[in-house]
Regions:
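Residue-level recognition of short loop/turn positions
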Residues: 46, 107-109, 227-229
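Solvent-exposed, charged amphipathic helical/linker segments at domain boundaries
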Residues: 117-132
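Short hydrophobic/aromatic beta-strand micro-patches
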Residues: 13, 75-77, 131-133, 194-196
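A short, acidic/glycine-rich surface segment
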Residues: 58-63, 176-182
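Core segments of cupin and vicinal oxygen chelate
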Residues: 2-56, 83-84, 90-98, 103-104, ...
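Conserved Rossmann-like nucleotide-cofactor binding loop
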Residues: 79, 94, 111, 198, ...
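Eukaryotic phosphotyrosine signaling hubs
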Residues: 7, 70-72, 186-191
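Short, structured interface segments
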Residues: 99-121
């Protein structure tokens, strides 16, 4: 039987996780579910979760360049993205760019995120996807689709999308891609995925078979790996 994991959440690094979690909770209408000194979890309206991990030496990304790359960003769905963007700015965001039906901003920790128009969303924003930068978006999409038991639902020149169990992850094709080299502070991670498995040994075997690398970190209930694009991720019980 093929071993697959279950996507638990995407976690963003920040120096001030209280400020960042409160920003997203207030902007999107989401709920803070777990709060510890080094970790906060926020739950979206449809039950997805986003983590905020304390990183005292966090270096903010500087989008759109690759000297301090974004690595990850969140795509949020809202009915009335222009009004939502003004509200985000009032809460501490910075406007970065405008698209035909979306606006790109940086949150208070510097992580870019997109507010995307979707009619009829209601007062609580939706989380469409966490989007991960890659030098080969299709290859990274297939890696995670196989690891998570999800389906590749789109592939194109700009990126790829996988979906399953009510969750989606996008992969953005990036020219001149500069990978994280965690735990090297000169090339820090900006975010990571937490993936639940039933058995750490079996999960590790599957991840390595698909092209991941084991990193020298972890504990009794989790292990840390790098995906083929260098992004760290955790397998957890």
């Amino acid at each position: 039987m093929t071993v697959t994991g279950r996507l638990e959440l995407v976690a963003l690094d920040a120096r001030d996780i209280d400020k960042l979690a409160s920003f997203y909770a207030e902007l999107a209408g989401w709920e803070i579910k777990r709060k510890e000194s080094d970790w906060i979890t926020v739950r979206t309206g449809d039950g997805q979760e986003i983590g905020f991990q304390l990183a005292p030496d966090h270096v903010a990304p500087r989008w759109p360049g690759q000297e301090h790359p974004q690595q990850f960003h969140l795509d949020l769905l809202v009915d009335g993205y222009e009004a939502a963007a003004e509200r985000a700015i009032g809460l501490g965001a910075t406007r970065l760019a405008d698209g035909p039906t979306w606006v790109t901003l940086a949150d208070p920790a510097g992580h870019p995120f997109d507010l995307c128009q979707k009619d009829g969303v209601g007062p609580v924003m939706g989380l469409f996807a966490a989007t991960i930068d890659a030098p080969d978006a299709s290859a990274l999409a297939r890696f995670y689709a196989n690891l998570l038991g999800m389906e590749v639902t789109y592939e194109g020149p700009e990126g790829a999308l996988i979906a399953g169990d009510g969750k989606s992850v996008m992969f953005q094709q990036v020219s001149g891609y500069n990978p994280p080299r965690w735990p090297d502070p000169a090339h820090p991670q900006q975010a990571h995925l937490d993936i639940i498995v039933d058995d750490l040994d079996a999960g590790e075997g599957r991840a390595l078979e698909l092209g991941a690398s084991r990193l020298n970190a972890g504990g009794e209930r989790f292990r840390v790996f790098a995906d083929p694009a260098g992004h760290p991720f955790c397998l957890t019980l």
